[in-house]
Amino acid sequence: MNSRDYWKAREETQRQKNIAQEAEYSRRIQDIYTKMYQNIQDDINSFYVKYADAEGITLAEAKKRISKLDIDEYAAKAKRYVEQAAKDRAANHGKTDRTAAYFSDQANAEMRLYNATMKINRLELLKAHLGLEMIEGHDELEKLFGDALTQRTLDEFKRQAGILGNTILNNEKLADSIVNASFHNAEFSDRVWMAQDLMKYRLHEILTQALIKGLNPRTLASEVMPFIKKEILENKRAAAERLLRTELCRVQTDAQMQSYQKNGYDQYIFLAEPTACKHCKALDNK
C-alpha cells in the first residue's frame, strides 16, 4: 500500500467512526423531539378536554379569559421547570457544564419572554404551555450540540497529534473558541434557538387555523395532531440533524486547520469522501 492509499484508508476509518457517532446523536435528537411532541400533544388534549363542549371549541371560545386556577396551573408548571433547573445547577456547584440539565441563559430568557407577553386568555395560555415544552426541548438540544461539538473538536486534536507526531492540542479554551465561533454570522446555539422560534410560529399558526374552523374531536385527531406530528418529528427533527452534521464538520475541519498551523504545516492534500458533492469531489487529491 502506497502512502496516499494508506492515508485514504485511515481517513475512511475515521469517517466510519464519525458515521456511527452521528447515528447515536441522531437517536438522541429523535428522543428529544419525541418527548417534546408527546408533551405538546398532552397539552393540546388537556386544553380540549378542559374547554370544549359537545361541538368542540371555537376561536371565540379559546379567546375567553382564563380563570385563576388556570393561571395557577401554568405558574406551577413553570415553577417546576425553574426549580429543577436550580437544583441541577446547585448540584454542579454553579459551574457551566453542558452535561448538566439546568437551563441555559438562552432558555431562561425565552421563559421570561413567555411569562411577560402571555395574554390572559385560553389560547395564549395554551401557547404558553407549548412554549414551556419547546424551551425544555431546545435547551436539551443546545446541551447535546455543545457536548457533541466539544467532543468532536477534542477528538480531532488528539487524532491530529497522532498523525503529526506532536503534542496533543488538548486546550479546552481553544476547543470552546472553535465550538462557539460564528459561522455565517451565527453561533450554533443561535441556530438551535432560531429553530425553536420557527417551530413556535408554525405550531401557533396550525392551532389558530384549527380554532377558526372549530376545534372538535375530528379536527383534533385528523388535522391538528398529524400536522404537528409531522412538523416536530419529521421536519424540525431532520433540520436539527442536518444542523448538527454541518456543525460537526465545521469544528472538525477547524480543529484540523488549528493543528496544522500550530505545528507549522501550510500544505496538505484534500481527500474527498465518497458522498461529497461535485464541487468537493473536484478537489479530490489536490
Which ranges hold each PLM region?
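N-terminal leader/targeting and assembly helices and adjacent pre-domain segments
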Residues: 1-230
